[in-house]
Amino acid sequence: MQKSYLLNTIGFLFSLLFCLPSFAAQTEAPLPDTFAEHKIVLQISDSDPFKQTLVLNVAGNLQRYYGADNVDIEVVAFGPGVRLMFDGNTNSQRINTLMDSGIRFSACQNTINHMAKKLGYTPKIQKNVGIVPAGAGRILQLNAAGWQILKP
């Protein structure tokens, strides 16, 4: 009886060992394919309109400074910063213009879920904004892949 229990336990542990990496891979957003010399992730976690405008200014300024072909930029929003990416936000047109120039925008699914509970409805996120499982996790994922983090 003990031998059977031990074998089942070992089998279960080995199955976990091989399954967990596939579960972890499913929770992370894929890394962008980039050959840019500079890779920058901008964090916005504040609902202050001044800081939200600042992060958009920095994104555009960095792209102009390095040149669109030489820099890859992703703006990641979590916490109150997700409001920047709400559909109909006063910066929606500006975000569209920056996206058209190649800058990516990502919003935190955890924050959206939390806001939905508080608001009683799921807030609509601007079209073409990527949704990532966790905004802070996305920033760390990009940093581990060599991206520089800026929090203007």
Language-model features and meaning:
Residues 3, 21-23:
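A subset of signal/propeptide-processing and intrinsically disordered low-complexity segments
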Residues 5, 17, 27-30:
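Hydrophobic alpha-helical segments with strong N-terminal bias
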Residues 1-10:
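Bacterial N-terminal signal peptides that target proteins for export
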Residues 9-21:
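Bacterial N-terminal signal peptides
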Residues 24-152:
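Secreted/extracellular ectodomain signature
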